[in-house]
């Protein structure tokens, strides 16, 4: 049975950005970062009103095809509730198409907002964290960014074949508590990157020794992120995707080289073009100034908790 939500319920979802891969953990490792989109959803008597402020406001659709709206509708359906109308306000701070998980954050934020509306009506209904990971990953097609935004901290994520052929894969993730000394800095170029394009640069087959290398570094990354940050340089090495994408990301590749030569563990953030740097030391002022002079935004970011939802009654 579907329950109709009363008019005047309002929730705010605050959802973090994320960085995927972290070097060796292609489509597996993710990290939640302290840069947030806010999604305010209010139930109304009829229709859909959507407003978008900040990043991407001029580029995304202001209607039912907006990813946040589709995620809200999917979340309401999964929670067994329905709204006669919705007012949706998106306040975006996460840059779009830069490798910081903006689409995953939109999906997670919309689903979490829908879950908040359901639980505002009845605390016994709604979606579990596992369901939020599953549903948001279905939008993405892989769970690394989405699960990081749901759970916070660092995540190891994976997928399994569906129980019924034709269904969605089963997506799962386990949260890692990041060592408190680790700091994150994102160097964000102005140009955008297409995930589809950069994925298209990857070979279908890889040498066994490269697969073995990345398996070892992915395991080491778990140790480095949680207990041994002194191992971050080795733990962020990769042979499967960064060099292959380098021709499409010249500025990114150059800055990864600059930072690693300076002893800072740097990787492509997701599909790029953002550079993610992880360290236990403050980011060098001279490198920050040089990056800005090269047209990069320098964002010093906390390691974030997962999506948060607050509820009010209008």
From Swiss-Prot:
Protein family per UniProt: Belongs to the GHMP kinase family. Homoserine kinase subfamily.
Catalyzed reaction equations: L-homoserine + ATP = O-phospho-L-homoserine + ADP + H(+)
GO cellular component term, pick one: cytoplasm
Name the record gives this protein: Homoserine kinase
Predominant localisation class: cytoplasm
EC number in record: 2.7.1.39
Species this protein is from: Rhodococcus erythropolis (strain PR4 / NBRC 100887)
Residues that coordinate or bind ATP: 95-105
SUPFAM superfamilies the record matches: GHMP Kinase, C-terminal domain, Ribosomal protein S5 domain 2-like
Keyword entries, A-Z: Amino-acid biosynthesis, ATP-binding, Cytoplasm, Kinase, Nucleotide-binding, Threonine biosynthesis, Transferase
GO molecular function, one term: homoserine kinase activity
InterPro entries in UniProt: GHMP_kinase_C_dom (IPR013750), GHMP_kinase_C_sf (IPR036554), GHMP_kinase_N_dom (IPR006204), GHMP_knse_ATP-bd_CS (IPR006203), Homoserine_kinase (IPR000870), Ribosomal_Su5_D2-typ_SF (IPR020568), Ribsml_uS5_D2-typ_fold_subgr (IPR014721)
Role noted for this protein: Catalyzes the ATP-dependent phosphorylation of L-homoserine to L-homoserine phosphate.
């Amino acid at each position: 049975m579907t329950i109709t939500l009363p008019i005047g319920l309002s929730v705010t979802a605050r959802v973090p950005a994320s960085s995927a891969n972290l070097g060796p953990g292609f489509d597996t490792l993710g990290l939640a970062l302290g840069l947030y989109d806010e999604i305010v959803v209010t139930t109304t008597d009829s229709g859909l009103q959507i407003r978008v402020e900040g990043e991407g406001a001029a580029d995304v659709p202001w209607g039912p095809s907006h990813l946040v709206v589709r995620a809200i509708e999917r979340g309401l359906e999964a929670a067994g509730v329905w709204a006669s109308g919705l007012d949706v306000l998106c306040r975006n701070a996460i840059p779009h198409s830069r490798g910081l998980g903006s689409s995953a954050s939109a999906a997670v934020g919309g689903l979490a907002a829908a879950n908040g509306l359901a639980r505002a009506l009845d605390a016994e209904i709604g979606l579990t964290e596992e369901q939020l990971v599953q549903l948001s990953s279905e939008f993405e097609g892989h769970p690394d960014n989405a699960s990081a935004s749901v759970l916070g901290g660092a995540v190891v994520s994976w997928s399994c074949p569906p129980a019924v052929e034709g269904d969605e894969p089963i997506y799962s993730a386990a949260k890692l508590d990041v060592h408190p000394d680790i700091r994150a800095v994102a160097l964000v170029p102005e140009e955008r990157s297409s995930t589809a394009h950069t994925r298209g640069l990857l070979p279908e087959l890889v040498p066994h020794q490269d697969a073995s290398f990345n398996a070892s570094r992915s395991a080491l990354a778990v140790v480095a992120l949680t207990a041994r940050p002194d191992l971050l340089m080795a733990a962020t090495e990769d042979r499967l995707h960064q060099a292959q994408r380098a021709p499409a990301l010249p500025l990114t590749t150059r800055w990864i080289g600059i930072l690693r030569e300076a002893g800072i563990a740097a990787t492509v953030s997701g599909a790029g073009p953002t550079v993610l740097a992880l360290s236990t030391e403050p980011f060098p002022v001279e490198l920050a100034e040089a990056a800005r002079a090269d047209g990069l935004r320098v964002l010093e970011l906390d390691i974030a908790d997962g999506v948060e939802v607050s509820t009010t009654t209008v």
